[in-house]
Amino acid sequence: MSNKGQLLQDPFLNALRKEHVPVSIYLVNGIKLQGNIESFDQYVVLLRNTVTQMVYKHAISTVVPARPVNFHPDAEASS
C-alpha cells in the first residue's frame, strides 16, 4: 500500500476510533458490518459490536460513519 493512501486512511480511521463513532462497513461482496473501530493497521480493521471482528482492508469497499467526523489529513494527501 502506498504511503499516500496511509496519509488519508490513518487520520480518518483514527478519528472514528477516538470519537467512538459507529460505522457501517460494506465489503466488496455486499455484506454490511456495523460496529465501532477498535483498532487498525496497514492490513486489517478490528470492528467491535457484540464481538470483535478482524476485517481485512482488501475486502472493504466503503466505510460509512453514522455521523460526520472531523479529521485532518496531511496536506500532501489532498494533492
Curated annotation (Swiss-Prot):
This is RNA-binding protein Hfq. GO terms for cellular component: cytosol. The keyword Aminoacyl-tRNA synthetase does not apply. HAMAP family: Hfq. It comes from the Bacteria. Residues 10-69 form the Sm domain. One of its GO terms (molecular function) is RNA binding. The gene is hfq. It comes from Burkholderia multivorans (strain ATCC 17616 / 249). InterPro entries: Hfq (IPR005001), LSM_dom_sf (IPR010920), Sm (IPR047575). Gene3D superfamilies: 2.30.30.100. One of its GO terms (biological process) is regulation of RNA stability. Homohexamer. Belongs to the Hfq family. RNA chaperone that binds small regulatory RNA (sRNAs) and mRNAs to facilitate mRNA translational regulation in response to envelope stress, environmental stress and changes in metabolite concentrations. Also binds with high specificity to tRNAs. Keywords: RNA-binding, Stress response. Pfam families: Hfq (PF17209).
